[in-house]
Amino acid sequence: MSRTLVYAIGGNALSSPSGDDEEKAALVLAKVMSDVVDLLEAGWRVILTHGNGPQVGHLMSLDPSLPMEEWVSATQGMIGYSLSITLESILRRRNRPEANSVILTRVEVDPDDSGFKFPTKPVGPILNSQQVMSEDWDIAETVNGPRRVVASPEPLRILDIDIIRSLINQNAIVICCGGGGIPVVKRDGHYAGVPAVIDKDRVSSKLAIEMGVDALIISTAVDAIRTGFATKSEKIHRTLTIDQAKMYLKSGEFPAGSMGPKVASLIDF
């Protein structure tokens, strides 16, 4: 019987935070999709999710008048298409029969989530003194430099999970929950979008748990987890126990908006 996994691809693995070297990003994407086909050949069924931090921030800066959640939905289509067409090419080249499908995915959040009050999710490129920045932007220092940060509430429910389950049960490769999913809240019995970017690792963990999959993979643009980052005591960790991960997370080794959500998501799973 086939095993199933959720494979979360980082937005920075698809496009660098500085916004350059798109040719290199395309090569990385092709390598990731080749890895996905390797998993299929090893007997796994694969659900793909992806980030959108660099891409959604760039689009938001082009037209700030559009609601943030609409830009999230736009990146689901744009990045989903890129993943799909790259994956399709590799599938055909390696004589694989699987179809793939991109699902526009809505994710319910709590309108009173503290994430709306304390923005932590980096979006867009690394900022410099030459770039135009709005006065109402929240800016935070990341490991690569200053970036805009936006609200990032916790995912409560994946509204389109039944469609995802149906497709994976037909042995399709499902691309879903792009950019953490389109954030919506329930008002008067109806769903409405809200301005936020849900962390894709948090929703990937939620998806993995609700789908009852066998494994969760979170890929990153870095080679390993580190504690004491950028200090003399920096240490590389190739493996961590759950207890170690909890200890380091609690002590603040993994910052919000970076490695923190990844470690927390893997602990939850």
Task: Give short role names for the model-derived ranges.
Residues 10-14, 54, 179-182, 222-223, ...:
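Short connector loops/turns at beta-strand edges and beta->alpha or beta->beta junctions
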Residues 1-49, 58-60, 166-171:
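N-terminal glycine-/serine-/threonine-rich phosphate-binding loop
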Residues 27-37, 68-86, 90-91, 151-168, ...:
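Polyanion-binding loop/helix "lid" in catalytic or ligand-binding cores
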Residues 53, 57-65, 230-231:
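Glycine-rich loop at the start of a catalytic domain that most often binds anionic cofactors/ligands
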Residues 17-20, 62, 186-190, 229-231:
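Short acidic, glycine/proline-rich loop/turn micro-motifs
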